[in-house]
UniProtKB/Swiss-Prot annotation:
Pfam families: RNA_pol_L_2 (PF13656). SUPFAM superfamilies: RBP11-like subunits of RNA polymerase. The gene is Polr1d. GO terms for biological process: DNA-templated transcription. Its main location: nucleus. This is DNA-directed RNA polymerases I and III subunit RPAC2. DNA-dependent RNA polymerase catalyzes the transcription of DNA into RNA using the four ribonucleoside triphosphates as substrates. Common core component of RNA polymerases I and III which synthesize ribosomal RNA precursors and small RNAs, such as 5S rRNA and tRNAs, respectively. It is found in: Nucleus; Nucleus, Nucleolus. Keywords: Acetylation, DNA-directed RNA polymerase, Nucleus, Transcription. GO terms for molecular function: DNA binding; DNA-directed RNA polymerase activity; protein dimerization activity. It comes from Mus musculus. The modification N-acetylmethionine is found at M1. It comes from the Eukaryota. Belongs to the archaeal Rpo11/eukaryotic RPB11/RPC19 RNA polymerase subunit family. Component of the RNA polymerase I and RNA polymerase III complexes consisting of at least 13 and 17 subunits, respectively. Pol I complex consists of a ten-subunit catalytic core composed of POLR1A/RPA1, POLR1B/RPA2, POLR1C/RPAC1, POLR1D/RPAC2, POLR1H/RPA12, POLR2E/RPABC1, POLR2F/RPABC2, POLR2H/RPABC3, POLR2K/RPABC4 and POLR2L/RPABC5; a mobile stalk subunit POLR1F/RPA43 protruding from the core and additional subunits homologous to general transcription factors POLR1E/RPA49 and POLR1G/RPA34.
Length: 133
């Protein structure tokens, strides 16, 4: 129970700036009345298919996850609803957090490889005295 309260504190601390200067939470946790912690919808504001599909793919690789899907509410709104349902007693928050961390690791790995490739490319061009892009 304390983990849920800690997560709520963290979630409420995530803010995104709005056009009129007002602040709005970047992440909401929606749970229908009478449901358990294993089935939760996360509303991510200011996000789209880029994050939604990547996160869905990574979360579904977890064998404890029974269902993970996302929808965009409307093309003119930049928010997604990510629904996670787990097997057993695992709260849906855990695969969500793990998925975000794994996605961050993948992105960092891609960035490191990309920057190394650019550095190698420029070094080869410099040694041949060819102009780079």
């Amino acid at each position: 129970m304390e983990d849920d309260q800690e997560l709520e504190r963290k979630i409420s601390g995530l803010k995104t700036s709005m056009a009129e200067g007002e602040r709005k939470t970047a992440l909401e946790m929606v749970q229908a009345a009478g449901t358990d912690r294993q089935c939760v919808t996360f509303v991510l504001h200011e996000e789209d298919h880029t994050l939604g599909n990547c996160l869905r793919y990574i979360i579904m690789k977890n064998p404890e996850v029974e269902f993970c899907g996302y929808t965009t509410t409307h093309p003119s709104e930049s928010k997604i609803n990510l629904r996670i349902q787990t097997r057993g007693a695992l709260p849906a928050v855990e695969p969500f957090q793990k998925g975000l961390n794994e996605l961050l690791n993948v992105c960092q790995h891609v960035l490191v490889k990309f920057e190394a490739s650019i550095k190698d490319y420029k070094a080869k061009k410099a040694s041949k005295k060819e102009p780079t892009f």
